[in-house]
Amino acid sequence: MDNQTPSELIDAKLAGLGDWRGATLARLRALIHEADPEVAESVKWRKVSNPLGVPVWEHSGIICTGEVYRDKVKLTFACGASLGDPNGLFNASLDGNTRRAIDIPEGGSIDAEAFKALIREAVALNMVKKQPKR
């Protein structure tokens, strides 16, 4: 398992779920790649209780993480509080100063175009934050 690439680890996590959560996270993953073909996948926070870790999508910093719970799939945006979210996709972690999240329950859906726009906005924010200070 340690010789696997991050993308292979994410593939294994999705395959191992084998239910609606895996299908939902796979769809969100595809939308992230559609929105930003240069996105890099990584896996963070691997531990005994979660050996495949948490999928992370990055471009000039973390865009979002994909967490799986019994009753939902959660996409947490690292700098979500700084994003406009004109379509109101954020529905969790709304009180924090930094992060925002989208919880998708079984049978739930997401507006694909609005989600891709949110991904592109997060990438643009990361790129501005990475510019050297003068």
What are these regions (language model features)?
Residues M1-R134:
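Charge-dense, helix-prone N-terminal extensions
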